[in-house]
Amino acid sequence: MGKMRVGIGYDVHRFEEGKKLMLGGIEIPFEKGLKGHSDGDVLIHALIDGILGAAGLGDIGEHFPDTDVAYKEVDSKILLKRVLELVSEHYVVNNVDCIVVTERPKLSPYKDRIRTSLAELLGVSKERVNVKAKTEEGLGFTGREEGIKAYAVVLLEERY
C-alpha cells in the first residue's frame, strides 16, 4: 500500500428558480436548482476540493475560477474528470465519505444512485463511496431552505 493523503472539501450554493438540481452527477427532482457559475453541483464541488486538498493542489476556485466564461454552466462531472486527470499520475482515490446538508428535498431515495454515479466518476467500487444526507433541523442557511451545503473527505493513495 502506498502513502495515504487526506483532504476535506466543502461547498455551498443557494437555491435558484428555473434550474435543475444536480447532486453527485445526477438530477434530483425538485422545484429549484442551485445557483452557481457551473451547474451548481455542490456535492461534486466539495469532492473536487477534497481531492485537490489531499493532493496539495489548492482549491476548486484556483483551477476553475467563476470569472472564467469557459466554465459558465459547465457540467461539474467534466470538472471532476479534469481534476482526476490532474492527480492520476501520482494518486488514486482510495475512498470518499460525503455529507449533503439540506432540509428539502429528502435525499434518502436518491443516495444509492448518487453513490453509484460518484463511484463511476471516480473509477472506484461503490463500497469506496459513502453519501450521508443530513438536515439542520430548521437552523441556519440550510435549515431555512435557502440552499444546500456539502462536505467530502477524500483519501488518496500514492501510486507505486
From Swiss-Prot:
Bridged cysteine pairs (disulfide): none
Catalytic reaction equation(s): 4-CDP-2-C-methyl-D-erythritol 2-phosphate = 2-C-methyl-D-erythritol 2,4-cyclic diphosphate + CMP
Annotated site (Transition state stabilizer): 37, 135
Cofactor binding note of this UniProt entry: Binds 1 divalent metal cation per subunit.
InterPro entries: MECDP_synthase (IPR003526), MECDP_synthase_CS (IPR020555), MECDP_synthase_sf (IPR036571)
Transmembrane portions of the chain: none
MF annotations from Gene Ontology: 2-C-methyl-D-erythritol 2,4-cyclodiphosphate synthase activity; metal ion binding
Keyword vocabulary terms for this entry: Isoprene biosynthesis, Lyase, Metal-binding
CDD domains in alphabetical order: MECDP_synthase
Cofactor: a divalent metal cation
Key word Metal-binding present: yes
Pfam families: YgbB
Pathway membership: Isoprenoid biosynthesis; isopentenyl diphosphate biosynthesis via DXP pathway; isopentenyl diphosphate from 1-deoxy-D-xylulose 5-phosphate: step 4/6
Gene3D superfamilies in UniProt: 2-C-methyl-D-erythritol 2,4-cyclodiphosphate synthase
Entry binding sites for 4-CDP-2-C-methyl-D-erythritol 2-phosphate: 11-13, 37-38, 59-61, 64-68, 141, 144
Domain of life assignment: Bacteria
Keyword Nuclease attached: no
EC numbers for this chain: 4.6.1.12
Residues given in the record as a divalent metal cation binding sites: 11, 13, 45
One GO-annotated biological process of the protein: terpenoid biosynthetic process
Catalytic class of the enzyme: lyase
Oligomer status and interactors: Homotrimer.
Reported function: Involved in the biosynthesis of isopentenyl diphosphate (IPP) and dimethylallyl diphosphate (DMAPP), two major building blocks of isoprenoid compounds. Catalyzes the conversion of 4-diphosphocytidyl-2-C-methyl-D-erythritol 2-phosphate (CDP-ME2P) to 2-C-methyl-D-erythritol 2,4-cyclodiphosphate (ME-CPP) with a corresponding release of cytidine 5-monophosphate (CMP).
Family in the record: Belongs to the IspF family.
Protein name, UniProt field: 2-C-methyl-D-erythritol 2,4-cyclodiphosphate synthase
